[in-house]
Amino acid sequence: MPERSRSWTLFAIMIAMIVLAVRAPSARAQDARDLYQSTAIVTGTDMRSRPTGFAQCLRDVLVKVSGEPRLIKDARVAELGRHADAFVVSFSYVDVMAGIPVHDDQGTYDRPHYLTVKFDPAHIDHVLADLGETPWRGERPVVVPMLSLRRYGPPFVLSAELPNGADARASFAGRAEEFGLTARIPTEAELTVWGAAPGQIPSPPTAARPHEVVVAGTLEFKESVPGWEGSWRMRQNGRDYAWGISGVNYDEAFRDIIRGVLRVASGHDGPK
C-alpha cells in the first residue's frame, strides 16, 4: 500500500479510537441488552478482519456482562473467540472515514470501519455459566477518580475544570465505558472538601452521591520503569482495597482502575 494511503489509514484509526472512547452511551442509561453488544475497529467489510473483530467483541461482552476482567486473558475465552460467529445475532459496519475523499485503496479495500456486533443474550449467559460466571444484574457504579498525576512538570489533581486535564478526562471516561461503567470527574470544589492536593491524595472519602465509588490514587510517569506507575485505593461495602500497576501506557493505567472497581462491584474477590 502506498505510504500516503498508509498515513491516511493510521490517522483515521486514531480518530476512530478517540470517537469510540466517547460515543458509547452512559452505562447507567444502558439496559441489559446494550451490554450484549460491542464495537471494534477493523479493516474493510470483508472476511479479512471480521473474525478478529467478532472475537474481540465477544471477549469484551463476556467481561462487561459478568464483571470479571480476568476473562480477558482466559485461554478458554480465546478459544471461544475462534467460533464467535456462532453467538452473533447481527452485525453492522460504519465507515470511519465517511466523508473523507478516497485515497488509493482506502476507497475500496483498506478503509477502517466500526464493526458493531450484537450477541444473543441467552447464548452469552450459557457461555458464562460454562466459564463458572454469572451475569451481573446489579446497578453499575459511577467511578469517581481522585487522582494526582505527574509527567514531566509539577503534579496536578485531575478535576472537571482543569484546562490541561481534557485528555485525561476523555481517556478515563472512555476506559470506563469499555467495561460497561461510567465515570464522573470531581469538581475542584469537591476535591478541596476532600483535602486532595497535588502529590497529596488522602484516603478515599464516602461518595457524595448514591452508586458512586471514589478511587484515590497517584499516577506518575517514570523514565526508569519506563512507563506510568499508579497506585489506587478505594473503600467499598465496608472494606478497603489497594492495588496498582507499573510500566504501562496512560490508557492502560486507567483501565487498571476500572478493572478493579468492576471486580469488586460485581461481587468478585478483589481488584486483582
Where in the sequence are the language-model features?
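Amphipathic beta-strand/beta-sheet edge segments enriched in Tyr/Trp
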Residues: Y36-T39, H113-T116, D120-H123, A207-G260
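N-terminal segment of the mature soluble domain
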Residues: A55-E79, E139-P198
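C-terminal/domain-edge helix-coil "capping" segments
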Residues: R33, T52-Q56, D60-G67, F119, ...
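Signal peptide-directed extracytoplasmic domains
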Residues: D74-L147
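Bacterial N-terminal signal peptides
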Residues: F11-A21
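A short, hydrophobic beta-strand-centered structural micro-motif
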Residues: V89-I100, P145-L147, I185-P186, G195-G230
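N-terminal Sec/ER secretory leader and immediately downstream segment
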Residues: L35-D85, V89-A98
